[in-house]
Each structure stands twice: as C-alpha cells, then as structure tokens.
Amino acid sequence: MFLALREIVTARGRFFLIGGVVALITLLLVMLSGLTQGLSKQNTSALEALGEQTPYVTFSTEDPSFTESEIFAEDVPASGIPLGTSQTKLEGHGGVAVFGLPEGTQIPGSSTVIPEEGMVLSQSIDDALNAPSRGTLGGVDLDVNAVVEDEYYSHSPVVWVSTATWQKVSHSPEDMVGVAV
C-alpha cells in the first residue's frame, strides 16, 4: 500500500491520465447504452403500447417470414385482435408506419378509438403538416379524425386506421386482417 501511495505522489500525471481514460470510457458506455435504449424504443414503442400480452405466431411453412406473413379472419382467435402493419408514404410528410386495427378499438395511451373511415395521426406528423384536415396515405385520400401522442414503429411515426382502410392502403386482400409482428 505504501508503494502505491508513493507512486501516486511521484507520478501524478500518469495516475490522472489513467484515471481520466477510465472515466471517459465509463462515460462512453453510459452514453451508448442511452442511445441504444432510445433507438430500440423508437423502433417498437407502438407495439409495446398495444399491451403486455405475449403474441404467439405459428408459421405453416418451413421458411417462416415476418415480412411475407398474412393473417386471415379465420386465423384470429375469438379473443384476439388482428393487427395490420405496413410502411407507406403520407403525402407531404414522407414515410410512416400504418397500424390497422378493428373499427372502435381504443388507441393505446388515448381515449380515441379507431374510426370507420379516416385516419388518426401521431402528434409529430400533425405538427409537421400544420394540422391538416385531409391527407393522402399510400394513394388513398382520407380525413384526419384525431391526433394522438407519438408512437413509433420501425423508426417511423404511426398513423392509426381501421382494418378496412389498412387493407386499401397496404393493397392487401379483403380477407386478410393482419400480419405477424
């Protein structure tokens, strides 16, 4: 112990240099963990907001693929709520994630429900477009029914629509009600 204290006193510069490097590495790790948490939150916050129920998906082919998944009305259990997701463009804004839920389903974190026709925008989209009353989502003209708190999916703000509207926007068959996520 005496030798260590004597070394610190005689070689102060080296001691502070090594201590500074350790402190900077610690700071780097803290900042990187915060960055990765933020990125992961923006990737899946809309899915996490839907609830804590664990989804179970069974694929019927040998090569399962989430991107090519299709869930039809007869595949949804009585207690299940089908969720359709897709990525498309909202005219004047750019890329958005579209979440299709059955009409009347409550949007997470809000008292707003999914309208029969039209769309519900995330706050950041509404701010960027200066509160529009209509918009073209994936080539389909829709009214803006409400604005809710921001949720994100795949780093894109979410637009909430009914299953029927989601089918039009994502160009899906009429009997397809969702995808595996």
Which positions does each model-derived feature cover?
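Single, functionally critical "micro-switch" positions that shape active/binding sites
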Residues: 10, 24, 81-83, 121
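Hydrophobic, regular-secondary-structure patches
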Residues: 26-97
